[in-house]
């Protein structure tokens, strides 16, 4: 591709944060010329459906086109814009009204912040006025698979991109067994999604992870147990408290030897054990990275140094309420991308709006959360019985989630946790869990309670300590039968 020698706005990375920044720049600077450099083969798209809705479609052809039915029944595709929204990079200089170009399948390999120059992998140099780094990261693999033979590696994949979805979707059409490694958000959502398809098509799904239950690092133990039983009910063989020690080939299949001595024969393995953050521009760009949280260190305005901002997964930012953080979630990519874009176009806003995140295990159980959600923190939970209206399906129908077209979790020091719950039943139909640090609420998790995020956001902003959480929970109206 031919590139302009100079661009006004250079956005490195083609994901949600980059897209949100582009929208924010265009809002403030109507004739902006913006170049997005993406390693992906597709124009910017949203990732959440890749582990959620795309798997629940009965229409195979639609899934191949990355189209899906929202939980509320409406059809759409994963792309933020139609293809003709973007122009070719070489056409950008001539766009007197402004324009947005995307260069796919390439990457920036070095930055020269003194002269404001970015160099692409083919040696092309592009001078920029303002630059955003929103490179996210690459999914981690495990040494046991990384060091395996080429024959084994053919049957092992990681999961992050639309291409990964297409590949895995094709694989699942011809296997008897598939195994997911990892018990966090991605691993658990994917296991449920594959379980759903497996029950229809006829393959078994295993899920293996070291924690004592699904989402064990984020949910209090009683919710972890409940979630694990929910995942099992989706047809998943959940194997907790263990890891894969060794992998060999047996009759064309993978034989996984677990630490517990158990052996599992499977046709394909998907590794979902988190993200390795891409900070490859740190050295050439003279950018500081964060040893504790990973990612590039930026200030509260998401700026790393003059003319360089960082948003999304790779941004380790300063949050005036909760301290230094790094967050890997869709809504954070939207919020931080938007903020960085506004500031690149002359704004002076600091990080204030707490991003939220959600995780749906199919259309019937889901949660939304905000702030610091970590099972090592003391928690207080208040629960009530759920009704039909308390599902992701109903929430989406009410239009309560920001898909990012317009408009996360992290670790803190491990410490003993105290869990109280005022749920009389083991059902945990719907409820709210408060995560505390020094007695103050730093995180709120809404379990099958939707549309109450503004209340939770205000609580974190206020940083108060409360005496009676049952009273506080009433603010979320978990006992009322219908949404107001």
Predicted regions and their residues:
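Rossmann-like dinucleotide-binding cores of NAD(P)H-dependent redox enzymes
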Residues: 177, 185-248, 353-359, 366
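Residue-level detector of alpha-helix initiation sites
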Residues: 15-19, 41, 137-139, 163, ...
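N-terminal Rossmann-like dinucleotide/flavin-binding domain of flavoprotein oxidoreductases
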Residues: 24-125, 219-237
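Cysteine/selenocysteine-centered motifs that mediate thiol-based redox chemistry or coordinate metal-sulfur cofactors
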Residues: 168, 466-484
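FAD-binding core/adjacent interface of flavoenzyme oxidoreductases
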Residues: 1-12, 24, 81-179, 257-259, ...
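Mid-to-C-terminal Rossmann-like scaffold of FAD/NAD(P)H-dependent oxidoreductases
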Residues: 1-7, 314-452
């Amino acid at each position: 591709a031919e590139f302009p020698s100079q661009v006004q706005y250079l956005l490195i990375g083609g994901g949600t944060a980059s897209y949100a920044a582009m929208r924010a720049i265009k809002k403030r600077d109507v004739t902006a010329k913006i170049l997005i450099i993406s390693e992906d083969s597709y124009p910017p798209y949203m990732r959440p459906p890749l582990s959620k809705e795309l798997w629940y479609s009965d229409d195979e052809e639609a899934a191949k086109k990355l189209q899906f039915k929202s939980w509320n029944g409406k059809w759409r595709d994963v792309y933020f814009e139609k293809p003709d929204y973007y122009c070719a990079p070489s056409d950008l200089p001539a766009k007197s009204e402004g324009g947005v170009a995307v260069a796919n399948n390439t990457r920036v390999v070095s930055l020269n912040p003194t002269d404001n120059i970015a160099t692409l992998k083919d040696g092309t140099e592009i001078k920029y006025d303002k630059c955003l780094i929103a490179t996210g990261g690459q999914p981690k693999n495990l040494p046991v698979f990384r060091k395996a033979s080429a024959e084994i590696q053919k049957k092992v994949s990681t999961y992050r991109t639309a291409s990964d979805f297409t590949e895995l979707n094709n694989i699942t059409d011809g296997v008897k067994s598939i195994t997911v490694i990892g018990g966090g958000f991605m691993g658990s959502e994917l296991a449920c999604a594959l379980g759903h398809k497996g029950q229809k098509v006829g393959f078994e799904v295993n899920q293996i992870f070291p924690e004592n239950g699904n989402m064990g690092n984020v949910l209090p133990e009683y919710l972890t147990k409940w979630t694990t039983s929910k995942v099992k009910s989706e047809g998943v063989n959940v194997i907790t408290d263990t890891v894969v020690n060794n992998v060999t080939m047996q009759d064309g299949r993978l034989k996984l030897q677990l630490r517990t001595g158990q052996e599992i024969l499977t046709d394909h393995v998907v590794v979902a054990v988190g993200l390795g953050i891409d900070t490859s521009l740190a050295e050439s760009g003279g950018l500081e990275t964060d040893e504790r949280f990973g990612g590039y260190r930026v200030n509260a305005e998401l700026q790393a140094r003059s003319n360089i901002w960082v948003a999304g997964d790779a941004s380790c930012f300063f949050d005036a309420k909760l301290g230094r953080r790094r967050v890997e979630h869709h809504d954070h990519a939207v919020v931080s991308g938007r903020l960085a874009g506004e500031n690149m176009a002359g704004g002076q806003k600091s990080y204030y709006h707490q991003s939220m995140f959600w995780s749906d295990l199919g259309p019937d159980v889901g949660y939304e959360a905000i702030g610091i959600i970590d099972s090592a923190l003391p928690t207080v939970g208040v629960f009530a019985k759920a009704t039909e209206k308390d599902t992701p399906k109903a929430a989406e129908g009410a239009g309560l989630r920001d898909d990012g077209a317009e408009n996360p979790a992290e670790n803190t020091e491990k410490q003993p946790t105290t869990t109280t719950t005022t749920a009389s039943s083991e059902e945990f139909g719907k409820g709210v869990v408060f995560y505390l640090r020094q007695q103050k609420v730093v995180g709120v998790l809404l379990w099958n309670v939707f549309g109450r995020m503004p209340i939770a956001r205000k609580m974190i902003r206020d940083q108060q300590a409360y005496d009676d959480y049952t009273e506080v929970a009433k603010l979320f109206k978990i006992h009322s039968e219908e949404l107001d």
